[in-house]
Amino acid sequence: MFGFLKKNFLDPHQEKSGNGWIARLKSGLARTGSQLTGLFGRGGKIDDDLYEELETILITADVGMDATNALLADLRRYVREHHLSEAAQLKEALAHCLLKLLKLLKPLAQPLQAQDQIKTHKPFVIMLCGVNGAGKTTSIGKLAKYLQGQGLSVLLAAGDTFRAAAREQLAEWGARNNVTVIAQQGGDAAAVIYDAIQSAQARKIDVVLADTAGRLATQAHLMEEIKKVKRVIAKALPETPTSPAAPHEVLLVLDANTGQNALSQVKAFDQALGVTGLILTKLDGTAKGGVIAAIARAHPIPVRFIGVGEGLDDLRPFVAEDFVAALLGLDEQ
């Protein structure tokens, strides 16, 4: 029944170095899996109390009401159609419903195709945004490493000019990756990124990663400022007959621990910037991770990467099957 979850979905690079990474993902999402194991393993009949407990587990895992209701409706339908009565039998029913959940998540699992993009977009400009503390600057360092692993040259733009620590942190990531960082103390964010793009063109760099200052979606003046940054980026690298204007990718970085607040962040930043992809960070901590299912239903924007640690290799492409297996603790069933 769970054979579809046992398949190894890692790419060859992940197979070499990903075992510990996948283990950290499972560990970070273990709370939900252990709760489900306890619910199904204690025996008893399938009744309204059992469904209510399952609903609570899913909601507290940040799956959200909409996605939870859809999953439970499918589960109840399956139980009726197959005349199931024992709690332990819900594993089979849940596996059936997971197949539908995978269909929901699979369209979101769209890896960043930078190698293909630079054939017509060079430099390929990636703008990163998000609230304070989501892990933007750290994600840029990891993303630089990931892109270098694909044989691409990278330049970093220190567009978070509000925090000196952000420039220093980006410089540190640049040193660790042997990547040039363009920064100005007290400079204008748009000007810094503009200069970085010009520098990348002169050096024939493949990819520019542009950091921006963290901001709350409710801070209207700061949201207007980041719109200006995007407009300036478009002026630095305007549309051509073969390429759209930069930025070619707008990545929103989300802290997995923010739960349902992530939905409002996605909505606000997408309205302001036209978000093309998401990075979900900090899945190695207390994150419950079900918010991805909620995002899939409310704002189906591709999840490009998920992160589970501080190491350079701890940012990986999102694989729906691996994620759902780890989230629901069913990979070993």
Regions found by a protein language model. Name each.
Residues 1-127, 149, 154-155, 176, ...:
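Non-catalytic terminal/linker segments enriched in charged/polar, low-complexity residues
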Residues 99, 108-333:
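P-loop/Walker A NTP-binding module and the surrounding RecA-like catalytic core of P-loop NTPases
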